[in-house]
């Protein structure tokens, strides 16, 4: 693992171009931290607490009522170990050691009106911030050749709160090195706001210059990771870094729980791309066609993710 440090930019710096050369360098690596983007620590805490209360207090019946029956959509509650990123990426069959709640623009499954109000406001603030950030990232590289940016950024985003419980002994690093498999996101960009593990363990890592780099919690900041759409619209200049969530070893299980609030700025489902170009840029697209839509791609992944083997 590398000891490289990923820089922190403020939205004000990105807007005024005061660190433009450095920002362009890190946009071309596909990962950086961002502060001053609109949402506050209180916004994150209220939304996280709302979901965590439901995880802890919701009955089995209440959780079942907000568990989607549509395998191609991320909506509502997903139980602990109900998904496997490893299956999607063909890196194993182990499950994601987390539970989650997800929402989007429509088709949502809210546990209560209060939950809906808190999460809708949170979603809207992150959507605005992610749109502005994506515009700055995609134009920084100087190679943008996608459709009109306003059209691309009229998106079908997903907001997901993941809770990674304290790691049990059988999922310690000695037995299973990861809580979540290496993957890149199917998004334009992704915001990740994380809470730190109480014991100081850093779980999130991303690939930078061919090495995995730790991404610890930074106060008032989100991690920005560029997703698979970025290389498709920048002639490969902006990558989609692989990232994963690693497991602590047996000596650091206590206090290893954490949360991760993830906003995927996904294009509309009718966004069309060249499958050969995607493969040229290192993306694993198994669809047997020359041109595909984002809806074709994402739907296949979600079905595979939920086909958890026992």
UniProtKB/Swiss-Prot annotation:
Annotated SUPFAM superfamilies: Clavaminate synthase-like
EC number: 1.14.11.26
Pfam families: 2OG-FeII_Oxy
Residue ranges of domain Fe2OG dioxygenase in the record: 154-267
The keyword Cell membrane is assigned to this record: no
Reaction(s) the record says it catalyses: deacetoxycephalosporin C + 2-oxoglutarate + O2 = deacetylcephalosporin C + succinate + CO2
GO BP term (any one): antibiotic biosynthetic process
Cofactor(s) it depends on: Fe cation
Pathway, per record: Antibiotic biosynthesis; cephalosporin C biosynthesis
Keywords: Antibiotic biosynthesis, Iron, Oxidoreductase, Vitamin C
GO molecular function, one term: deacetoxycephalosporin-C hydroxylase activity
Role, per record: Hydroxylation of desacetoxicephalosporin C in 3'position to form deacetylcephalosporin C.
Protein name, entry field: Deacetoxycephalosporin C hydroxylase
């Amino acid at each position: 693992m590398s000891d490289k440090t990923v820089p922190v930019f403020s939205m004000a710096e990105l807007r005024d171009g005061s660190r433009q050369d450095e920002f362009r360098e890190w946009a071309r690596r596909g990962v950086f931290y961002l502060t001053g983007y609109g949402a506050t620590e209180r916004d994150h805490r209220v939304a996280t607490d709302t979901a965590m209360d439901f995880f802890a207090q919701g009955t089995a019946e209440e959780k079942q009522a907000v568990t989607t029956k549509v395998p191609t959509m991320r909506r509502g509650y997903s139980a602990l170990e109900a998904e496997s990123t490893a299956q999607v990426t063909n890196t194993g069959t182990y499950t994601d050691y987390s539970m989650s709640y997800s929402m989007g623009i429509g088709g949502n499954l809210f546990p209560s009106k209060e939950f809906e109000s808190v999460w809708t406001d949170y979603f809207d603030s992150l959507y605005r911030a992610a749109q502005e950030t994506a515009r700055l990232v995609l134009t920084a590289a100087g190679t943008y050749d996608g459709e009109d940016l306003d059209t691309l950024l009229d998106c079908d985003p997903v907001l997901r709160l993941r809770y990674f419980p304290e790691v049990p002994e059988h999922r310690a690093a000695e037995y299973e090195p990861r809580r979540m498999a290496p993957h890149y996101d199917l998004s334009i960009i992704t915001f990740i706001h994380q809470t730190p593990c109480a014991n100081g363990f850093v779980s999130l890592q991303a690939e930078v210059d061919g090495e995995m780099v730790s991404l610890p919690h930074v106060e008032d900041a989100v991690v920005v990771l560029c997703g698979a759409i970025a290389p498709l619209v920048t002639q490969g200049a902006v990558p989609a870094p692989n990232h994963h969530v690693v497991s602590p070893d047996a000596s650091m299980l206590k206090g290893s729980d954490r949360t991760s609030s993830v906003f995927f700025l996904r294009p509309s489902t009718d966004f069309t791309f060249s499958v050969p170009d995607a493969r040229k840029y290192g993306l694993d697209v198994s669809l047997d066609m020359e041109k595909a839509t984002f809806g074709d791609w994402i739907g296949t992944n979600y079905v595979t993710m939920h086909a958890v083997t026992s």
